[in-house]
Amino acid sequence: MINKLTIDSLKPLKIPVCFQRYSGKAEAYVTFHEYLETGEEYEDDEETLTAHYVQVDVWSKNDYTEIVKEAKNLLRAAGFKRLSEIDLYEEDTKVYHKGLKFYYIEER
């Protein structure tokens, strides 16, 4: 559920969006993974809300500022809440990398 929602939410970026790994040749792309899924709320011992914690990584050979801005807007519009973000640079591949952490609450 969360994988499809993440991919569908980021489609308007018009760059590849892939679960965990990307092996293509695009200069800019997005990967993501769910790093935690946990029950958030219970009623009568039944889970009623599930939290999905997702890291979205933007990778680019060039300035990714606009891609990151649009990705954050798209994810917020889909109901994701931003937790944190970090600027990284992959020295070995000379690729700019922005890590964005979000969570999404799913009603059961």
In which residue ranges do the predicted regions lie?
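Long, contiguous binding/interaction regions
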Residues: M1-R108
